[in-house]
């Protein structure tokens, strides 16, 4: 399985931002024009990037189609993107706008029967299942829902296995406690998921600080790593990360 480094941009009101642990009230802005950043990603050798529509994630209705089209026209990047996917037609529209893969998050927890059907309809290579997880006091990985205020009635392991049986090829898993914290990725979580889900490219997301963390994620069996805040704050060289 190849290992893919995904430089990431989160977009809100047209700006490049980062949220601390997903909290819209804890936002840091990194400028108004995302396109030059994507061009820099490509110039440094990236083949893929990860693009998140934070406005749509909150209110629905994917808003980044014009940006996505510009990225595809002006760079060589393939784009994995999501935010605000509320149904099948949203997936189709985002793919039609030029996405290489569509990220399906909260709906993957709330309506798995429907999302399983999309793996077959659109192809498992075109869908990334994204699960935000938090470890409880008993060591079980739960899936918080409703703004991370309560847990779903299914665990991370059980839902991930269900999607794997249905043909899932790409799983993006974020340890909520590490998101935007630059505290290092939860390597034990990714070792566990990689062993649990043979043949699935598990993407490490949350807490990656430097090239050593990227190398550690790869060694843990991951198929990819999402690089967000560390790149924006120039704590990491993308070309070095791509060489891991």
UniProtKB/Swiss-Prot annotation:
GO terms for biological process: L-histidine biosynthetic process; L-tryptophan biosynthetic process. Its EC number is 5.3.1.16. One of its GO terms (cellular component) is cytoplasm. The active site is at residues 10, 132. Keywords: Amino-acid biosynthesis, Cytoplasm, Histidine biosynthesis, Isomerase. GO terms for molecular function: 1-(5-phosphoribosyl)-5-[(5-phosphoribosylamino)methylideneamino]imidazole-4-carboxamide isomerase activity. It catalyses: 1-(5-phospho-beta-D-ribosyl)-5-[(5-phospho-beta-D-ribosylamino)methylideneamino]imidazole-4-carboxamide = 5-[(5-phospho-1-deoxy-D-ribulos-1-ylimino)methylamino]-1-(5-phospho-beta-D-ribosyl)imidazole-4-carboxamide. Pathway: Amino-acid biosynthesis; L-histidine biosynthesis; L-histidine from 5-phospho-alpha-D-ribose 1-diphosphate: step 4/9. This is 1-(5-phosphoribosyl)-5-[(5-phosphoribosylamino)methylideneamino] imidazole-4-carboxamide isomerase. It comes from Stenotrophomonas maltophilia (strain R551-3).
């Amino acid at each position: 399985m190849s290992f893919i480094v995904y430089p990431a941009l989160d977009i809100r009101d047209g700006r490049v931002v980062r949220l601390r642990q997903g909290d819209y009230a804890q936002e840091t802005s990194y400028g108004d024009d995302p396109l030059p950043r994507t061009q820099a990603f490509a110039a440094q050798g990236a083949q893929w990037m990860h693009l998140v529509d934070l406005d749509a994630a909150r209110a629905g209705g994917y808003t980044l189609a014009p940006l996505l089209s510009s990225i595809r026209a002006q760079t060589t990047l393939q784009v994995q993107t999501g935010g605000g996917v509320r149904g099948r037609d949203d997936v189709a529209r985002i793919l039609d706008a030029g996405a290489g893969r569509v990220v399906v998050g909260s709906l993957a927890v709330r309506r798995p029967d429907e999302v399983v059907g999309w793996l077959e309809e659109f192809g498992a290579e075109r869908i990334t299942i994204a699960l935000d997880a938090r470890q409880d006091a008993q060591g079980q990985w739960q899936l918080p829902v409703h703004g991370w205020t309560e847990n779903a009635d299914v665990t991370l392991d059980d839902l991930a296995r269900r999607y794997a049986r249905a043909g899932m090829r790409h799983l993006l898993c974020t340890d909520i406690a590490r998101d935007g914290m630059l505290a290092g990725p939860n390597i034990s979580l990714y070792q566990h998921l990689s062993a649990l889900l043979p043949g699935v490219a598990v993407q490490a997301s949350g807490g990656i600080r430097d090239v050593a963390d990227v190398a550690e994620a790869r060694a843990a069996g991951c198929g990819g790593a999402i690089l967000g805040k560390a790149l924006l704050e120039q704590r990491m060289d993308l070309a070095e990360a791509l060489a891991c």
